[in-house]
Structures are given as C-alpha cells and as structure tokens.
Design a protein with these regions (language model features):
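Conserved AdoMet/S-adenosylmethionine-binding subsite of the radical SAM
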Residues: 1-128
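C-terminal accessory extensions appended to soluble enzyme cores
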Residues: 108-160
C-alpha cells in the first residue's frame, strides 16, 4: 500500500524511523518504494502557528529525498504568489511533485498574479511535476490538457 504523509512539522524524522526500525521485519527499502513525505510550504511562517518554520521543513524534505524517499510540496494555500514561487524554486532538485492551490473564499487573488505564477511555473528548469488544483485551473479557465507535459492531473501516481 502506498502512503503519502503530509505535514507542517520537520522534527518527526528521527522518532519516526526509530519507531519503524523497532518493528519486526522492518525493511527501509520497501518503505522507500511505498512512502512519500509531503510538506505544506507557504513561505509565510507567521501565518502557520505550531508549524516548523519553512526552512526547517525544506531541510527535512531534502534529507528524506537524499535518503531515497519520494517527496512532494503542497504549496497551498498560495498566500502570496511570488513567495510560493520562491519556495518551489528553493526545493527544485529534491521534490518529486508540486501541488499548487489557492485559498478558498478568504483571499481576493488578482487573476494576473495567478497567471504570472503559472507562467513562471512553466519556465522552471528540469520540468518538475506540477499539479494545479482546481482552484487555479478554474480561476484561469485552463484545461489541463493545454498545459505542458510536466503538469499532471489528479490521477498522477508518484509511485510509478
């Protein structure tokens, strides 16, 4: 069974692997094939109480990826498009999938700002896998089929 864990914490890794390794028959190679670690990254620490700071989450994500695990970023809600883009740039090379979505109902996004974000995402080096949530495609009235190949649908399986 494939498992995706999503967190705003960075301080769980040592205890998590200590507990896993205590289980009879634990095989980290199997875990690497079936566990993906995701981190919510908004770039706005002050608005995320009881969360590890974004730089700590990014560091933990990099460590897990170096250890052989799949990783993903939930860049949502986008609080500020430029900040979200910077967080994505800061994690290039050790993130297997980016999920980008808007805050529903509480923020008045300028359509031009969201379009600029998508335009910049299309220019990222290495063509990382990106899933735009319906909040983004709906606002821009974009059909996912018109996006570049590295933009994936909700049926994308990061374990294949």
């Amino acid at each position: 069974i494939n498992v995706k864990l999503l967190t705003k914490r960075a301080d769980f890794v040592d205890e998590f692997f200590r507990l896993l390794s205590a289980v009879e028959g634990y095989d980290e190679e199997i875990c690497k094939r079936h566990i993906a670690f995701g981190f919510t990254l908004t770039g706005c620490d002050g608005q995320e109480g009881n969360s590890s700071p974004n730089p700590e989450r990014i560091s933990t994500m990099k460590q897990l990826h170096a250890r052989g695990y799949r990783t993903f970023v939930s860049a949502e809600p986008v609080i500020d498009p430029k900040t979200s883009l910077q967080v994505i740039r800061d994690t290039l090379g050790f993130c297997d999938l980016y999920k980008v979505g808007l805050l529903s109902g509480k923020k008045d996004y300028g359509k031009a700002d969201v379009q600029d974000l998508v335009d910049e995402l299309q220019k990222l080096p290495g063509k990382p896998k990106i899933y735009l949530k319906n909040s983004v495609t709906g606002m821009l009235k974009r059909d996912r089929n018109t996006l570049p190949d590295n933009f994936v649908g909700n049926d994308y399986n990061m374990f294949e």
